[in-house]
A protein has these predicted regions:
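Catalytic alpha/beta core domains of metabolic enzymes, predominantly
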Residues: 1-131
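Fold-independent oxyanion-binding glycine-rich loops
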Residues: 20-21, 46-47, 69, 112, ...
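Hydrophobic alpha-helical bundle architecture
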Residues: 125-155
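Beta-strand/loop-dominated core regions that host nucleotide or nucleotide-derived cofactor-binding catalytic loops
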Residues: 165-171, 175-198
């Protein structure tokens, strides 16, 4: 805050303060301390967080703690990678904390012995597709690996798909709608989302 005082004495008071560290716990503590001592807006982030994998984890933990305490006005997810990934990660962090509306939440189960479909690839495809429907605020999509537990686990989702052997299920609000050939699961899910979008616009 000494530098803030120095800048204020020069006649400037339209400021945003940024305090960053690659140490998550240090960064959290620093933001807690500065938030107690100033009303200036704070730009928060875990700097030099690392690669997409480790950087996302550090950023989610650090920013999650800071933002959940009502601290922070703007954020930056700092990754060694494609800047587009930084934006995507920031949106998910904000949405998870209830600080941002818009976009679809995709939930998917971990793979297990009952999985009879390439769930990892399918979940990635659904997440990529979901980004095209950023206007569907509050919609939850489930991607499940089997038809045994899939419908039950997807009951809180607006729409979901569950994989089987050569075919899967289309699920709405936990209820099985119909069987779908495996190669058509993504297409059928897209159609469901397009119908939701059309209904909301009308």
């Amino acid at each position: 805050l000494q530098k803030v005082d120095m800048i204020e004495k020069m006649g400037y008071d339209n400021l945003v303060i940024s305090i960053k560290s690659s140490d998550v716990l240090m960064c959290v503590k620093a933001h807690q301390l500065i938030a107690e001592r100033t009303n200036y807006p704070l730009h928060v982030g875990i700097t030099e967080a690392g690669t997409v994998f480790s950087g996302n984890i550090k950023s989610a933990v650090g920013l999650g703690i800071i933002l959940s305490q009502g601290i922070g006005d703007t954020i930056r997810v700092s990754l060694t990678g494609d800047p587009v990934e930084e934006i995507k990660s920031a949106k998910v962090i904000l949405r998870t904390l209830g600080l941002r509306k818009g976009g679809i939440e995709v939930v998917s189960c971990p793979t297990c012995g009952r999985t009879r479909i390439d769930l990892i690839r399918l979940a990635d495809q659904v997440e990529t597709m979901a980004a095209e429907f950023d206007d569907l605020d509050g919609v939850k999509v489930a991607v499940m690996g089997c038809v045994v537990n899939g419908p039950g686990e997807a009951r809180e989702a607006d729409v979901g798909i569950a994989g089987g052997i050569g075919e899967g299920l289309l699920i709405r609000k936990g209820q099985v709608v119909r069987k779908v050939p495996e190669e058509e699961l993504l297409t059928v899910l897209r159609r469901e989302l397009e119908e939701m979008r059309s209904e909301r616009r009308n």
